[in-house]
Regions:
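Short helix-loop-beta junction
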Residues: 83-86, 208-220, 330-339
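Gly/Ser/Thr-rich loops at beta-strand to alpha-helix junctions
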Residues: 67-73, 101-105, 126-141, 162-173, ...
Length: 420
């Protein structure tokens, strides 16, 4: 085995092209190294919004986890949080269940038993299943339909399939579709908009709220701000949806097909000029003009202040944070900083940033967190003195680290840089 961590420079990747990304940087082509840097990534119930926590985004919902005992153990971390007490239930599978699939017949009864034991009838029961049922080929839609008929409550599937992580519809894409599937058609209101993509709200002082209000929008819905199921249902009244995360596209398409609500996508960007261009495009689509000079100036001043304090900053940018590591690295280079290393998952979608980086920072190295040779990662020649992302912080423990992982999402791109 190679005794050093595999990497490519962005210049080398650009020369290879997006259709020839080295197999070492594509995780489904090799053995997976469960690096300590990505433990939270590999254990979605342990931190942030993994499949299980996201599945409970619908107010008054509960979840039945159908799995072998080893798959559900990390849920105990979530169960200890006040907001999730008495919302997780388990149907454990034994070896016979795995061989015969008999556990599927138990699910409707388990759902009914959960509902009967609760003081308040749940709005929906989410059935969370694991890779075991993926390998068995379980038709979970059919199972949920039977459970719904048996228990008399809505039942929806929630797939915790690590096997489909890099497929057409990964678990976090599917769960977003599931949590909005309960919405029923309502009369549309021209001054209502939904924000789709996150399971926690934007910061209260996010400029997006002011821009939308200035455009005549009176009500902005986010699933995380819905206090009860009735308020959740008012999301069907929206005139249009704003998609803030690409994993919400399927959900937005479902909105369009079922509820006739169109959508506009806004990407999470950290290049101030690109953010301004995106806002201009949104304003043009809505037939209005946005006044974004104040937040833009604040962002530019934050960058300048940070550059004055840390003129010699050399960054390592990880993927375990709120953003695309390649786009963020490109933004940092544009702001005058050096980016020595990126730890990320390359795709055709973010390869455009690699091409741009190759022109202005050709020696930036790209590593894959899940590549086995990361066992031999050596930081000694990197020159890094600042890191962004939990994974980057793991590789450079002695450096200043910004987790950039707040559950309350910050839209203004450089507010994270306001550190001394």
């Amino acid at each position: 085995m190679r005794q050093e961590a595999y990497f490519c420079t962005v210049k080398e990747l650009d020369e290879l092209g997006k259709n020839n990304i080295p197999r070492q940087l594509i995780s489904h082509t090799h053995l997976i190294y469960s690096s300590p840097a990505t433990l939270a990534f590999n254990s979605p119930g342990a931190e942030g919004f993994g499949v299980k926590r996201a599945g409970l985004a619908v107010p008054d919902s509960v979840m039945l986890i159908v799995s072998p005992g080893c798959c559900g153990r990390n849920t105990s971390v979530l169960s200890s949080m006040r907001a999730y007490q008495d919302r997780f239930y388990y149907l454990l599978m034994d070896e016979t269940d795995i061989v015969t699939g008999r556990h599927l017949k138990k699910i409707p009864k388990a759902v009914a038993e959960i509902c009967e034991g609760l003081k308040k009838k749940p709005s929906v029961v989410m059935i969370c299943i694991t890779c075991v049922d993926a390998l068995l080929g379980t038709d979970m839609e059919r199972v949920c339909h039977k459970a719904e008929e048996y228990a008399g409550v809505p039942v929806r599937p929630c797939y915790m399939y690590a096997l489909t992580r890099e497929g057409r519809k990964p678990p976090m894409v599917h769960v977003r579709q599931s949590v909005y599937s309960l919405l029923e058609p309502k009369k549309k209101k021209g001054n209502v908009v939904n924000l789709l993509g996150y399971f926690s709200p934007l910061t209260d002082d996010c400029e997006l709220y002011d821009l939308l209000h200035g455009a005549g929008v009176k009500t902005i819905h986010e699933i995380s701000r819905c206090k009860d199921y009735a308020q959740y249902q008012t999301m069907s009244e929206a005139n249009f949806n704003l998609v803030l995360h690409p994993e919400a596209r399927f959900a937005a398409e479902d909105f369009h097909d079922r509820l006739k609500i169109p959508y506009i996508e806004l990407r999470r960007l950290y290049q101030i000029d690109k953010i301004a261009s995106q806002y201009r495009a949104l304003a043009a689509a809505l037939g209005v003009e946005f006044e974004d000079e104040i937040p833009r100036k604040a962002a530019e001043e934050a960058v300048e202040k940070f550059r004055e304090i840390h003129p010699d900053a050399v960054f390592a940018v990880g993927e375990w944070m709120n953003g695309d590591p390649f786009e963020l690295a490109l933004a940092l280079v544009h702001y005058g900083f050096r980016v020595s290393e990126i730890y990320g998952t390359l795709s055709g979608e973010n390869f455009v940033y690699v091409k741009q980086l190759a022109k202005i920072s050709p020696d930036t190295k790209v590593f894959s967190n899940l590549e086995p040779t990361m066992l031999y990662y050596d930081k000694s020649q990197s020159g890094v003195n600042m890191t962004i992302g939990k994974d980057a912080g793991y590789y450079h423990k002695e450096c200043s680290n910004v987790l950039w992982l707040s559950l309350i999402h910050i839209s203004e791109p450089t507010r994270h840089l306001r550190i001394s």
